[in-house]
Amino acid sequence: MPASSLARWKRWLPGAVLLTFIAHAAAPKAPPVSSEPPAIRVPVWVEEEQPSSPAALRFEATINGRPARIAATQGPTSDLIVLVVLDLTDDISLIEPAKQALIDNISRLPANAWVGVLRAQDGLHVLADPNPDRKPAVNAIESLSTSGKPGLFETLDSALRIADSMMRASPVRVAVLYLTDGNIYNYREDYTNPVINSSDPHDLSRRFPEALVIEKVSRMQETLASLEGPLFIAHLHYRTDRLNEAYQNGLKTLADETAGEAEFSRSPADIPDSINRMFARMLSGSSLTVNLPSEARENLQVKITGRAGDAEARLYWRSRYVWKRKAKSL
């Protein structure tokens, strides 16, 4: 990673300082005054069998139908920070192949891709700060003990705020990858929506046992709409009961909200391929810094196009944001 990029965000380390920032960022505060035009970061992928190089594309953007200036482009070969969040509590026969696939992918990353490792149990904890040296990340993964309750729901907001802080501090791409085996029944909070009136056959809680999960996901989706880093989720254990299917659909909804992805492995053999695809996707993305028009509203609809000569590329990008004025850095 270029020294200039590192210098801008290295002050977030060590992890204790980083988590202190998250607590600070969650507190209400007045919008900062900035001389720079407000902007959002839009993740973009070229979705073609033989894609044009993003460097060869001429990107254009509109926000709520109005032209918007693209101030900067970070392509697939630009600096990348991957924040791996481990949320592993269950079957060791699934966890071990997942840890090995994770280590293999980290070892293959290019030199300008840095990896940090966090744990989601009992709050978000930094196990290895983002670093070009792979050893701290690998050691953290290998030594991880698997116990406790699932923590994805409780830590997701904080993890994505870390990603936002890094993107505001330096012109790098940042992605958040959750590796999880969570079962909705094992959360500390009860999402089972128990029957309120057992003597009433028409009690709605009988008909909609997944209502609490859906409500939780809806609230989280609105929070994620104001955060800009893409979210990737590799779930090690697809479950078929009604409540876990609602939970798994909710995880996919949250990843889709950020233009990331969620995959659910149905067998141990699926796990390495799923993690491989997640890393390939994170590496292949671009990030556009798009200035907001002066009349931009809170709810933003974004459209990105890319052309190579007269041909228009097939793109996938994040299209919905809720914009809230943010400080560039602390």
Predicted features, each with a name:
Residues 2-14:
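Bacterial N-terminal signal peptides that target proteins for export
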Residues 27-88, 95, 99-104:
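Eukaryote-biased intrinsically disordered, low-complexity acidic regions enriched in Ser/Thr/Pro
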Residues 33-40, 267-330:
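C-terminal "exit" segments of structured domains
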Residues 75-129, 135-180, 184-186, 207, 234, ...:
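Von Willebrand factor
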Residues 85-93, 104-105, 122-128, 140-149, ...:
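Second-shell loop/turn segments in exported
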Residues 182-253:
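VWA/integrin I-like adhesion module and closely mimicked acidic/polar interface patches used
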Residues 230-283:
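Von Willebrand factor A/integrin I-like adhesion domains
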